[in-house]
A protein has these predicted regions:
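Hydrophobic alpha-helical segments
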Residues: 1-114
């Protein structure tokens, strides 16, 4: 489990849920609204130039506000930035245990240096 997943597992108190979502959103125990959001974010990750108003309407019709979409897109974009920066900078990979420890710290204190 990597850093952002470890934070999500810590905040949810449910590592099995995070593992299930990462394995396959559609068969995970997420509710339909969250599955719709994850489908949309997957498109942001892989097909952002082809996103249309119809894509946004599908997520809105699942119950998400424009503000929620703004934050979801922003978090997605920031995570992509950080992941690419780390990949390209030669920062060494951390162990799963180090990610879990960092996840607990980030869940408790936020994404700040402690």
């Amino acid at each position: 489990m990597k850093s952002h997943a470890a934070v999500a597992a810590e905040l949810l108190g449910d590592e099995a849920m995070v593992t299930a979502v990462l394995a396959d959103v559609e068969s995970s125990p997420l509710d339909d609204a969250h599955k719709a959001l994850f489908r949309f974010i997957d498109r942001v990750n892989h097909e952002s130039p082809s996103i249309t108003e119809a894509d946004l309407e599908r997520v809105r019709s699942a119950g998400w506000s424009d503000e929620a979409l703004y934050f979801a897109i922003t978090v997605c974009a920031l995570f992509n930035f950080y992941n690419r920066w780390i990949d390209a900078s030669g920062v060494h990979a951390l162990s799963d245990e180090a990610h879990r420890h960092g996840g607990k710290r980030s869940a408790q204190y936020g994404y700040v240096r402690t």
